[in-house]
């Protein structure tokens, strides 16, 4: 989850921006 995967973008786009 804490990696910024494409699947994570679909579920939590905000978290992706933070972890990227």
UniProtKB/Swiss-Prot annotation:
Membrane-traversing stretches? none
What tissues express this gene product? Expressed by the venom gland.
Q: Where in the cell is it found?
A: Secreted
The regulatory note on its activity is:
Inhibited by PMSF and soybean trypsin inhibitor. Partially inhibited by DTT and cysteine. Not affected by EDTA.
Locate the Peptidase S1 domain: which residues? 1-20
Q: Biological process GO annotation list?
A: proteolysis
Protein EC: 3.4.21.-
The cellular component terms of Gene Ontology attached to this UniProt record, alphabetical and capped at eight, are: extracellular region
GO molecular function: any one?
serine-type peptidase activity
> Keywords, A to Z?
Disulfide bond, Fibrinogenolytic toxin, Fibrinolytic toxin, Hemostasis impairing toxin, Hydrolase, Protease, Secreted, Serine protease, Toxin
> Where's it mainly located?
secreted
Q: What class of enzyme is it?
A: hydrolase
Q: Which family does it belong to?
A: Belongs to the peptidase S1 family. Snake venom subfamily.
The record's misc note reads:
Negative results: does not show coagulant activity. Does not show activity on gamma-chain of fibrinogen. Does not activate Lys-plasminogen. Does not show hemorrhagic activity. Neither causes rabbit platelet aggregation nor inhibits platelet aggregation induced by ADP and collagen. Its molecular weight is estimated to be 32000.
Q: What does this protein do?
A: Fibrin(ogen)olytic serine protease degrades Bbeta-chain of human fibrinogen (FGB) and shows a lower activity on Aa-chain (FGA). Also degrades fibrin directly. Releases fibrinopeptide B and a small amount of fibrinopeptide A. Has also be shown to catalyze the hydrolysis of some chromogenic substrates such as S2238, S2160, S2302 and S2251.
Q: How does it assemble?
A: Monomer.
Q: What is this protein called?
A: Beta-fibrinogenase jerdofibrase
What does the record give as the organism's lineage? Eukaryota, Metazoa, Chordata, Craniata, Vertebrata
């Amino acid at each position: 989850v804490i990696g910024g995967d494409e699947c994570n973008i679909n579920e939590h786009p905000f978290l992706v921006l933070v972890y990227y």
